[in-house]
Structure formats: C-alpha cells, structure tokens
Amino acid sequence: MPRSRINGNFIDKTFSIVANILLRIIPTTSGEKEAFTYYRDGMSAQSEGNYAEALQNYYEAMRLEIDPYDRSYILYNIGLIHTSNGEHTKALEYYFRALERNPFLPQAFNNMAVICHYRGEQAIRQGDSEIAEAWFDQAAEYWKQAMALTPGNYIEAHNWLKITRRFE
C-alpha cells in the first residue's frame, strides 16, 4: 500500500490529495507519476524519521525520474538523511550531485557550509587549527553562495562571516 494512504498526519494527507489530483490533470508519463509517488512516499517516511524506508523510496524515484531539476531535489533529500545520520562525507556527495543538476539550491550550499563548519569545530577540539581554518574557509565560501542566491537569508551565517572577517 502506498505510504500516502497510511499516513495519519492531516497536512500530509492534504498534500497527498492535492498531489494525486495534480498528477491526474497535469499531462505526465506513467514513469513520471510513479517517480513522484516514490518521492512523495520518501518525503513522508523521512518526516517520520523512517530513514531506511525514505532512502528506498528516493533511490527508486531516482531510478525512474529523468528530469534533472526533479532529480536535484531527490538527491538533496538523500543528502539530508545522510546529514541526520552523521554521514557527512556521503551527505556532501549528494549535495554536490544535487547542485550539479540544479545550481540554484541555496539550502544545499547552506547544509554543505554547516558540515564544513562542524568539521572545523572538530579540528579545533583536536588541536589542529590549520585544518580548522581550511574547513572554516570552505564553509564561508558555501555560505556566500547560499546568500548570493537568497539575499537576506542565513542571517546567522552572515554574522559569522562578518565576525570572522570572511565577508567581502
């Protein structure tokens, strides 16, 4: 049974109903409809913390989806799961892959910056200030890209860039 039929959350049910109506009226191929169903089920599982199920759905959606823009969001969500699981190297890989298909994903740049900043903090705790600075510099570059795409967002990152004199 598709996940959309078993979800008890009102907002998810509403989204599923609207998505199903749109799938019926918008001209799409059966493959595109099936890919979207897997994507939607992946989002639902992810929102409930069922990451293994979400990944299965996302991988199936990736197998079926041909549109690069749509694939970018699937890859981004896979990156989110790996981030949540502390698998930062894998997460970065998926964010990069998402950005290759859609370079206008500020949230991917932000998440990459957060991971780099975290790694910089880890390097400081390990007493390696040179490595920490390299990670912080990389975080700064990603945050600048995110802010360029969405001016006015990422205020905390903007403040960090100013405080650390990384803002140009």
Swiss-Prot record:
Gene3D superfamilies assigned: Tetratricopeptide repeat domain
Sorted UniProt keywords: Chloroplast, Membrane, Photosynthesis, Plastid, Repeat, Thylakoid, TPR repeat
Annotated localization: Plastid, Chloroplast thylakoid membrane
SMART domains: TPR
Keyword Lyase attached: no
DNA damage found in the keyword field: no
GO terms under cellular component: chloroplast thylakoid membrane
Database matches in Pfam families: TPR_1 (PF00515)
Alphabetical GO biological process terms: photosynthesis
Topology within the bilayer: Peripheral membrane protein
Residues in coiled coil: none
Chain positions of TPR repeats: 35-68, 72-105, 120-153
Superkingdom, taxonomy of origin: Eukaryota
NCBIfam families: PRK02603.1
Annotated function: Essential for the assembly of the photosystem I (PSI) complex. May act as a chaperone-like factor to guide the assembly of the PSI subunits.
Similarity comment: Belongs to the Ycf3 family.
Protein name per the record: Photosystem I assembly protein Ycf3
Organism: Panax ginseng
Gene that encodes it: ycf3
